[in-house]
């Protein structure tokens, strides 16, 4: 969040961070309603499909408050801009990574998304991963399924992921998680069911828990979003709209993938930077 604060300060904007706190029962809808009631000049929202959130976005816009979604988009809402990664870009990148983890023992792949679409099979992400896997495997024998968890809250997501591992016959060989919350739930389920190393998790985002899981081999690889760009572009999108009444509808940010080796290298570099702050 430091990047967003710096970018905001450069634009003479006061940025207030509001988010889920384990010490409270507030969810994102609550924070949205608080921001609307406080008559914020603009709102930057990490959309997660929570019930009522899309209508809250529309309410904010109707009240003259511009809303910018980040990481996940509310495509049917009246939000002004989305800062993140396009489904096409994600599909291409994930397809390449998933294909690398396909081997002779791979029989089932499950893709978990939170996307505002009616048919998962029409998702660009699902389509591109499927195509990449079929090309890598050279056959149609691998079962690839997609599941949309958009309408689930945190508790429901945990239940849905846990249910996947309780059905032993249907446990996938590769589980693809397309958002932070689902990745965190999958990480915990893998530990609870003692399946580390048996199910390959392709995750999303780089929280401390997720990075630690990659280091330990619980998660095979995770998608790293350029948070510097994310912070800069989201503040830029809001301030541009406030100042000029217009902004780009989409700001694209870069991604890469971190496996165990990459995470360990990142840790070493962080320690070096702390020892030599002036270099």
Q: What spans do the regions from the language model cover?
A:
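Hinge/cleft segment of the Venus flytrap/periplasmic-binding protein
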Residues: 226-279
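Hydrophobic alpha-helical segments within soluble ligand-binding/sensing domains
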Residues: 83-109, 155-160, 206-210, 225-243
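Hydrophobic alpha-helical
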Residues: 32-33, 37, 42-62, 67, ...
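Second-shell loop/turn segments in exported
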Residues: 21, 79-85, 115-120, 145-151, ...
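Conserved acidic residues
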Residues: 41, 80, 107, 173-174, ...
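Short, solvent-exposed amphipathic alpha-helices that sit
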Residues: 1-11, 90-94, 120-143, 156, ...
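Alpha-helical recognition/docking segments in bacterial nutrient-uptake
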Residues: 1-89, 93
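Short beta-strand elements in bilobed, periplasmic/extracellular small-molecule ligand-binding domains
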Residues: 8-24, 108-111, 133-155
